[in-house]
């Protein structure tokens, strides 16, 4: 059995005293005082001050995902992307699979910029660049090579 209080005396003669609390549960402010307080605050107008300009930017930055984004398997020059195909077993059981584009990282000489540009492109786009030139293929695809 649990009881609140202090044990005074020996264990054979048990006596519990009531604990004395110093805080009272009575409200300190009366209704008239609260009414007076609200009447004082009723005339105050809260508006932006020239001393404290309104901050247009959010104070906290949005949370970013902890995982880094994976590079998409799409060729930026030709627009080629993965093909959905079926893997067919001997018993003709079909399961879905992806046939990825043959993307390669390649350093290509850019004649107009007089420098090498490192690109991730498909082997088909590489053949097209060798035939037509990097500027023509990039212009047709809408790619700005100055950023790369």
Curated annotation (Swiss-Prot):
Superkingdom per UniProt: Eukaryota
Pfam families cross-referenced by the UniProt entry: Ribosomal_L28
**Is Transit peptide a UniProt keyword of this protein?**
yes
| Gene Ontology CC: one annotated term | chloroplast
- Transit peptide feature range: 1-71
Q: Which UniProt keywords apply?
A: Chloroplast, Plastid, Ribonucleoprotein, Ribosomal protein, Transit peptide
Q: Where in the cell is it found?
A: Plastid, Chloroplast
Q: Which GO terms describe its biological process?
A: translation
Residues of the signal peptide = none
Q: Which Gene3D superfamilies match?
A: Ribosomal protein L28/L24 (2.30.170.40)
Q: What is its main location?
A: plastid
Spell out the molecular function terms from Gene Ontology: structural constituent of ribosome
Q: Write down the InterPro entries for this protein, in alphabetical order.
A: Ribosomal_bL28 (IPR026569), Ribosomal_bL28/bL31-like_sf (IPR034704), Ribosomal_bL28_bact-type (IPR001383), Ribosomal_bL28_sf (IPR037147)
Q: State the PANTHER family in the record.
A: 39S RIBOSOMAL PROTEIN L28, MITOCHONDRIAL (PTHR13528), LARGE RIBOSOMAL SUBUNIT PROTEIN BL28M (PTHR13528:SF2)
What's the subunit arrangement here? Component of the chloroplast large ribosomal subunit (LSU). Mature 70S chloroplast ribosomes of higher plants consist of a small (30S) and a large (50S) subunit. The 30S small subunit contains 1 molecule of ribosomal RNA (16S rRNA) and 24 different proteins. The 50S large subunit contains 3 rRNA molecules (23S, 5S and 4.5S rRNA) and 33 different proteins.
- NCBIfam families the record matches: L28
Biological role: Component of the chloroplast ribosome (chloro-ribosome), a dedicated translation machinery responsible for the synthesis of chloroplast genome-encoded proteins, including proteins of the transcription and translation machinery and components of the photosynthetic apparatus.
To which protein family does this belong?
Answer: Belongs to the bacterial ribosomal protein bL28 family.
Any idea what this protein is called?
A: Large ribosomal subunit protein bL28c
Q: What organism is this sequence from?
A: Spinacia oleracea (Spinach)
This protein's gene is called: RPL28
């Amino acid at each position: 059995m649990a009881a609140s209080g202090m044990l005074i005396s020996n264990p054979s003669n048990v006596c519990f005293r009531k604990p004395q609390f110093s805080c009272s549960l009575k409200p300190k402010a009366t209704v008239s005082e609260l009414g007076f307080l609200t009447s004082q605050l009723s005339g105050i107008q809260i508006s932006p001050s020239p001393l404290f300009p309104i901050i247009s930017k959010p104070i906290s930055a949005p949370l970013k995902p902890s995982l880094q984004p994976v590079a998409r398997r799409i060729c930026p020059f030709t627009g080629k992307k993965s093909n959905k195909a079926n893997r067919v077993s001997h018993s003709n059981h079909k399961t879905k699979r992806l046939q990825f584009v043959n993307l390669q990282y390649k350093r290509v000489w850019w004649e107009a910029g007089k420098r090498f540009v490192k690109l991730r492109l498909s082997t088909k786009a590489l053949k097209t660049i060798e035939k037509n030139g990097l500027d023509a293929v990039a212009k047709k695809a809408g790619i700005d090579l100055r950023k790369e």
